[in-house]
Design a protein with these regions (language model features):
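Transmembrane signal-anchor helices characteristic of membrane glycosylation enzymes that use polyprenol
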Residues: 1-55, 252-264
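Signature aromatic-anchored transmembrane alpha helix within multi-pass, membrane-resident enzymes
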Residues: 2-5, 149, 251, 341, ...
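Transmembrane-helix motifs of polytopic, lipid-linked glycan transferases
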Residues: 101-141, 183
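Specific aromatic-rich, kink-prone transmembrane helix
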Residues: 116, 160, 175-195, 204, ...
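Short hydrophobic alpha-helices at membrane interfaces in multi-pass membrane enzymes
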Residues: 144, 149-152, 187-210, 244-245
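Membrane-interface alpha helices of multi-pass inner-membrane proteins
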Residues: 154, 200-217, 250-255
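Hydrophobic/aromatic-rich transmembrane helices and adjacent perimembrane loops
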Residues: 177, 221, 363-403
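Membrane-lumen/periplasm interface segments of specific transmembrane helices
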Residues: 242-291, 301-317, 321, 354-356
Length: 581
């Protein structure tokens, strides 16, 4: 497992080195974690790239200002815990803005998630032994081996998933939401296996609910279904005191989180995302479309496009096995078989289905980037698929071994029964199954890591970044749209590299190059400018109007004007203009 984790970390560092740009939400993560003076648009005025950069980094003397971070999030629609973590890392590296600060936070979350998912898989596999009053040492050892095998297979498929790698590359809170989802799941599975809930369980539960809620509000959706399933289990077992203690602990932890962060109520019930989510959930007409959309994402970015084959294979083996069981029952040779749908599996299935459906109904539809909303349960879904396939295949092997034993007894009645059982034991088949599992994991990893399925890397930004670094001293004119002036902040990582920047609204009157404010700037006499222009109708005509210059394609006959489109990105077009005076 350690070797597997190290290999996956190496893969993550490889993709981290390829990350060349940022999603606008990632830039907001840095800004809302490290704000200094705030971002303001002063129309038709010069500013410096340093003033933008100061909003992305922690300046010396401004480290560990968690109160500012909390206040910034209260003005947005998210809880603050993830931003505390990012601010901490940036505080330890003051004055630096780097993708590795955010990736390192997510990488730590990935490692913790890996360990928790492995533990969840192990607990799911060994649960049946807890149902036996006095299991033998050999039985315990067999179930432990099963647990290790299941944990290794699940973590390998999960950690090499394109969606999971993308989640680490995306500098937002979803990887840490996965941490608390899996931590909460492990607490409940452990309680099922041990069949008791002590004070340590309730203490860890309270901490998990508190921190999970302060990481992302989707945590409540997960815990609602997990808690409902666990309460049904407590009711079935008639553990009345445990039920009261469980509900009380969850309510107290949630109440403490709301007392600490009261803005959460307005975010959920009055914020634009909360009201949008409620509206989408109430709209029954889009249910099938949304479920198909998110199922397709899981299939493509986690299962390599083979989800249908997995499900078909599980169903075929299960149906065949059921047929053989019925035939054995009619002939009086039915053998006792291990249950597949154990309480842990039922809890996993109920929770994953509830979360998947609710999030599919309420989350934003943003193409492949919408994977982040279902990311916290991708490990659970992989666990359910691998466990189901393993168990139905194991039942088939068990049935075949028993049938072979009966045939051997009839053919060789003089042979000792133990010798016949040893000859027909499924040991070799288990080795074949293990090799097949390794082959499947390698195939799934290859399918996930090829075809440019890992996103949030923005490799096309590499050329733009080179252009920016070559022109750091060139004055920049940002022509923004007043209706969407916040789109300026989508360019923060680039604008922070330039020395002088002039902001001007596209709808403004008068030529920019001859305006008093422009001429008073230190860069007014430059013979070259970089133009960032927001997308708009008649963009070329608007550009000429604002600069008071007609630009022919390429250069004019006298060579006095050079006009070139450098790149298009995020609703912006970058131009390079030389000798415009």
């Amino acid at each position: 497992m350690v070797l597997l984790l190290c290999l996956q970390i190496i893969v993550l560092f490889y993709y981290g080195s390829r990350k060349a740009g940022f999603h606008e939400d990632e830039l907001y993560s840095y800004y809302s974690s490290n704000k200094t003076a705030g971002l303001f648009v002063n129309d038709r005025e010069w500013t410096t790239g340093e003033s933008f950069r100061n909003e992305l980094v922690v300046l010396p003397g401004e480290q560990f200002r968690y109160g500012v971070v909390k206040q910034m999030q209260s003005w947005d629609v998210h809880p603050p815990l993830y931003y505390y973590l990012l601010h901490t890392v940036c505080s330890l590296t003051p004055g630096i803005f780097s993708k590795w600060q955010g990736i390192s936070v997510n990488l730590a979350g990935f490692v913790i998630s890996f360990i928790l998912l492995a533990y969840a898989a192990y607990l799911t596999a060994v649960y049946p032994i807890s149902m036996q009053p006095e299991p033998s040492d050999s039985q315990k050892q067999a179930y432990r081996k099963r647990g290790y095998a299941l944990a290794g297979t699940v973590c390998a498929m999960w950690g090499f998933g394109a969606a999971v790698i993308s989640g680490v590359m995306f500098i937002r809170m979803y990887q840490w939401l996965t941490v608390f989802v899996l931590l909460c799941l492990c607490l409940h599975l452990r309680a099922l296996v041990r069949k008791r809930e002590n004070w340590k369980f309730y203490l860890l539960l309270a901490v998990t609910v508190f921190l999970g809620f302060l990481t992302q509000y989707y945590y409540i959706i997960f815990h609602f279904f997990l808690g409902a399933g666990f309460c049904l289990y407590l009711l079935k077992e008639k553990k009345w005191k445990s039920l009261v203690a469980y509900v009380g602990t969850c309510a107290a932890a949630l109440g403490a989180a709301l007392v600490y962060y009261p803005s959460a109520l307005s975010h959920i019930f009055k914020g634009y995302r909360g009201t949008e989510a409620v509206g989408e959930f109430a709209n029954a007409s889009n249910t099938l479309e949304r479920i198909q959309f998110f199922t397709g994402l899981f299939d493509k970015y986690m299962m390599g496009g083979f989800l249908a084959i997995w499900l078909l294979l599980i169903c075929l083996i299960a149906v065949t096995n059921r047929f053989l069981q019925k035939r054995a029952k009619r002939s009086g040779r039915e053998q006792k078989r291990e249950r597949i749908l154990t309480p842990p599996v039922g809890l996993l299935l109920f929770t994953a289905a509830g979360y998947f459906f609710t999030v599919a109904k309420t989350a934003l539809l943003l193409g492949e980037t919408s994977n982040r909303y279902e990311l916290p349960i991708y490990g659970v879904l992989v666990l359910l698929l691998v466990y189901s396939l393993y168990m139905v295949q194991k039942e088939m092997e068990q049935g075949n071994a028993q049938a072979a034993e009966r045939i051997a007894l009839m053919a060789s009645p003089n042979l000792p029964k133990e010798e016949i059982r040893k000859q027909n034991a499924p040991g070799k088949k288990q080795k074949i199954t293990g090799k097949a599992a390794v082959l499947v994991v390698v195939l799934m990893a290859a399918l996930n890591l090829t075809g440019n399925k890992v996103f949030f890397l923005y490799p096309e930004e590499a050329g733009v970044q080179e252009f920016v670094h070559r022109n750091e001293t060139t004055p920049v004119i940002v022509l923004y749209n007043e209706a969407s002036e916040t789109h300026i902040w989508w360019l923060l990582d680039e604008l922070s590299e330039y020395e002088n920047i002039y902001l001007a609204s596209i709808s403004g009157e008068g030529e920019i190059l001859t305006s008093e404010n422009f001429l008073n700037g230190n860069a007014a006499e430059s013979q070259k400018y970089i133009i960032y222009m927001a997308d708009c109708e008649n963009q070329g005509e608007e550009l000429q109007r604002l600069l008071g210059t007609e630009f022919p394609d390429g250069s004019d006959a006298s060579g006095e004007i050079s006009y070139e489109e450098v790149a298009r990105k995020n609703m912006w077009t970058i131009y390079e203009i030389c000798s415009v005076k």
